[in-house]
Curated annotation (Swiss-Prot):
Source species of the chain: Macaca mulatta
The reaction(s) this protein catalyses: urate + O2 + H2O = 5-hydroxyisourate + H2O2
Name of the featured protein: Uricase
Pathway: Purine metabolism; urate degradation; (S)-allantoin from urate: step 1/3
Gene field: UOX
Active site (UniProt): K23 (charge relay system), T68 (charge relay system), H264 (charge relay system)
Family named by the database record: Belongs to the uricase family.
TM region(s), chain numbering: none
In-chain residues carrying the UniProt-annotated modification Phosphotyrosine: Y289
UniProt entry keywords in alphabetical sequence: Acetylation, Oxidoreductase, Peroxisome, Phosphoprotein, Purine metabolism
Motif interval(s): Microbody targeting signal: 302-304
Gene Ontology MF annotations: urate oxidase activity
Amino acid sequence: MADYHNNYKKNDELEFVRTGYGKDMVKVLHIQRDGKYHSIKEVATSVQLTLSSKKDYLHGDNSDIIPTDTIKNTVHVLAKFKGIKSIEAFGVNICEYFLSSFNHVIRAQVYVEEIPWKRLEKNGVKHVHAFIHTPTGTHFCEVEQLRSGPPVIHSGTKDLKVLKTTQSGFEGFIKDQFTTLPEVKDRCFATQVYCKWRYHQCRDVDFEATWGTIRDLVLEKFAGPYDKGEYSPSVQKTLYDIQVLSLSRVPEIEDMEISLPNIHYFNIDMSKMGLINKEEVLLPLDNPYGKITGTVKRKLSSRL
């Protein structure tokens, strides 16, 4: 180590853009027991800290480093003493702990993902302590806080896989010498929704209810009315319609990012077997797939 220090030479042509270190995928199952009625939150948490000095990078000096094993243990202890009311509140608790406990921590960033457990229910009666894994959209959040500022909270849903068998088409696109895709007025539309939004303020927000509301709005706009659906001329239009509906219904959010892969299902040609397949048997293709993204935010004038 001494030889390393003696051979160190500063490079004046380089500067740090951003640094961080931490612990990823710290898993916790928190059980809240109210008599025989139990509630659970299972989460996977990742923590990144930025320190005021760079001597660990520049000199191999570890004297300012909070070990990542300590970070893991801190997440466990905060779950015990603070509980997990919502993953957003848990993320804020973690940021605030490290910023208040260590003066040389200048930035804390926390990602929390909730494992989707749902309480068992039958005929309107909820089970007191049994749950079923229901992967119908994963709730996640990102919390970032600088020493000089309030926490910035993003929430989102991912892995929300949806499909409709009609009321979707794709026409009027550019055709050149490499185009083989035919226009279609009626097709299957399947996607796996990734949707993330930012809260413009964090006080008195019911994060759980807001997440549920936005998830329901995504499904509402994708599917349309239950008796007839709603036509989608493109994935892009559906994506934008989800954003417009969400920001109009949920005043707590400032912007929204959505990514929608276009998961393809193609009609299987059975003509060589003397059969006519009228879009009854389709072939799912995992890849390649189209990917449509978009982010919108409120204009400044709309907030005045």
